[in-house]
Amino acid sequence: MPTGPELAKLIETLQFAKDQKTFHKLRFFRPYMKQQEFMNAGAHFRERLLIAANQVGKSYTGAAETAMHLTGEYPVDWIGRQWTRPIKAWAAGESGQVVRDVSQKLLCGEPGVDTMLGTGMIPKDAFVERPSLARGVTAAYDTVQVKHLAPDGRSVDGISVLRFKSYEQGRAKFQGETSTWRGATRSRRWMSTPKSSRVSRRPAAWCSPPSPR
């Protein structure tokens, strides 16, 4: 039988493992072959489109890659698109509610539950502060600030900014502001489009306009 100190150490270790799986999902992301092919293509193509059936991991894949770019945390064998500096990103969808229930949930955690912040693909300790709320949709986020790790993987070299947008806001909401990485969901597709794309009628997308690696 373990002694008191040994038992305490075991409990501490198990709690740490549980917290890692709960609040650091990105570190446990292991893509399937097709998901990996889609992400690898980012190293060579400005536009990417992923079409598949419902509930097979399209949005999950997009959220994982977006979290990598926001945080600077890439797998050691990563060969897709990569930024060595903080980025400005968009995550968009057909409506504010859809964006909240899909993109926001996968990236940040269950909407409307404070204790669930950090249970999405963005690690809990990567949030600079609690995200600001959007207008018109309960528990929907507008802007998220994320700590970006330097290439050494240890120090923070800046803050990435993620903004949630919806097509129902109109074209004007997508004009003027610059972004490094753009993503959107629509129907059963994921698609990446260049900076000048028309967003109001596009199918789903995670997009990376031209930018130095």
Which residue stretches match the model-derived regions?
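Phosphate/NTP-binding elements of NTP-utilizing enzymes
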Residues: M1-R213
